[in-house]
């Protein structure tokens, strides 16, 4: 039986509720209706018209609706509930549905269940998207057909009919997706784990356990790629079911990818043999954290693609949007967009990628994560700090309380919004300076996501006269 037929067998004639109509669910709703499911859309929007252009599709598909304040009432009597990653797995309404006999799953979980090809998946607090993209491009350079999805690219489940056994699926997974997963990929990569999304998870341990899920359901033969520099990922070695390899920038390992100190060469060690991959000077990506991302990608694809494919991608790939992305140079000042930096560790990596003190725009939605680790890095790498958003006061307090603040010469400015922040940064900048949006915070106080935030910043910068 073909995978798409297996999916149809699962859902045909069943009552299926979708929580929300985000990008991935829109295509899945159409797919499920076509495969014979009785679909109900449960959404906080108050009326069908609130869905904009998609309202016409919902009407055409004759989708049932459970909208408004009591949208979770639509869970009652459902056979299957399709959870969106942003809807917490342990919310009472969802747990009640589970107890009532509903199957709670997601687009990614069903894809993992029915996918006929090898899956390579990446998780971590930082570096997921760049590492996932590097892996996909290495497979493409080797001539493989790649299906890219999860937190990046298009929804995978609606493409199930096109996936063949000789393809490869490369998937980025967040903790929100992993928390309920009971299947793992053939190759699992955990870049690092640091405090993040603590507004969503009940505590740090739940967040760590969600990340561990990428490993726990692996079936040999399989591979786990873990970051050696991170204490938490290093501790996950005990969770590995098959081959376990490291990636490390600061140490030399006998199994995995590392940066050789003697000649600054990215290498791979296996069975006592060390193979050079690429000199670090040829890497196009900015920042030492991206050396780690490239090492992780090489460890993931080792033995699956030729070394030349790794070299080609490593020496030509210039980055993903919103990740230390050059925007423009105006009056001798260079502006960068690092809107992806929604945590202190991500901002720290960005700061360390510059060889001068910069003007930093930071602040945003409060995810209840500590800012004390960011403070000394700000003092070391920032000349002017422009703060905005809900976390602005918390970042400022951490910086002012940090040893060395009084003698640092750091200037702190306060902005009401992004336009104001860019204007303040420009006013503080002199020829030769760097301005970077690297918020160390999520975007949700002012923007729906970091992409919209980054594009607004770029638009403002591009319109400076």
What does each model-found stretch correspond to?
Residues 32, 81, 122, 151, ...:
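Residue-level signal for inorganic ion chemistry
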Residues 3-15, 25-35, 145, 279-383:
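Nucleotide phosphate-binding/pyrophosphate-handling subdomain across enzymes
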Residues 40, 68-69, 105-109, 241-260, ...:
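Beta-strand->loop->alpha-helix junctions that form or flank phosphate-binding loops
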């Amino acid at each position: 039986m073909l995978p798409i037929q297996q999916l149809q067998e699962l859902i045909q004639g069943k009552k299926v509720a979708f929580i929300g109509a985000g990008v991935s669910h829109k295509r899945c709703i159409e797919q499920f209706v076509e495969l014979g499911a009785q679909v109900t859309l449960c959404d906080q929007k108050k009326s069908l018209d609130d869905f904009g252009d998609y309202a016409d599709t919902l009407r055409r598909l004759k989708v049932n609706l459970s909208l408004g304040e009591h949208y979770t009432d639509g869970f009652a009597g459902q056979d299957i509930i399709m959870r969106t990653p942003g809807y917490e797995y342990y919310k009472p309404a969802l747990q009640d549905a589970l107890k009532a006999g509903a199957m709670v799953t997601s687009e990614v979980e069903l894809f993992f269940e029915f996918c006929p090809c090898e899956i390579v998946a990446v998780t971590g607090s930082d570096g997921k998207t760049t590492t996932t993209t590097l892996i996909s491009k290495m497979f493409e350079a080797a001539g493989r057909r790649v299906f890219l999805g999860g937190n990046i690219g298009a929804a995978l489940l609606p493409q199930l009919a096109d996936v063949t056994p000789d393809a490869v699926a490369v998937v980025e997974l967040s903790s929100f997706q992993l928390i309920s997963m009971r299947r793992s990929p053939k190759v699992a990569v955990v870049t690092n784990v640091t405090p993040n999304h603590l507004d969503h998870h009940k505590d740090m341990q739940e967040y760590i356990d969600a990340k561990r899920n990428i490993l726990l359901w692996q079936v040999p033969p399989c591979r786990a790629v873990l970051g050696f520099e991170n204490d938490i990922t290093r501790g996950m070695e005990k969770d590995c079911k098959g081959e376990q390899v490291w990636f490390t920038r600061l140490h030399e390992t006998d199994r995995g990818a590392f940066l050789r100190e003697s000649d600054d060469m990215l290498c791979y060690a296996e069975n006592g043999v060390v193979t050079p991959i690429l000199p670090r000077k040829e890497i196009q990506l900015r920042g030492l954290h991206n050396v780690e991302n490239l090492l992780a990608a090489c460890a993931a694809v080792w033995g699956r693609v030729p070394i030349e494919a790794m070299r080609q991608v490593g020496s030509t790939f210039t980055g993903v949007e919103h990740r230390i992305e050059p925007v423009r140079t105006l009056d001798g000042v260079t502006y960068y967009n690092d809107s992806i930096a929604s945590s202190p560790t991500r901002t720290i990596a960005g700061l360390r990628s510059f060889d001068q003190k910069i003007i930093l725009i930071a602040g945003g939605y409060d995810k209840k994560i500590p800012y004390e680790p960011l403070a000394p890095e700000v003092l070391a790498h920032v000349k002017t700090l422009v703060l905005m958003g809900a976390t602005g006061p918390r970042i400022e307090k951490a910086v002012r309380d940090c040893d060395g603040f009084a003698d640092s010469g750091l200037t702190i400015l306060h902005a009401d919004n992004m336009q104001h922040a860019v204007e303040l940064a420009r006013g503080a900048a002199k020829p030769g300076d760097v301005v970077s949006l690297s918020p160390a915070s999520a975007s949700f106080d002012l923007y729906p996501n970091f992409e919209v935030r980054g594009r607004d910043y770029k638009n403002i910068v591009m319109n400076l006269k």
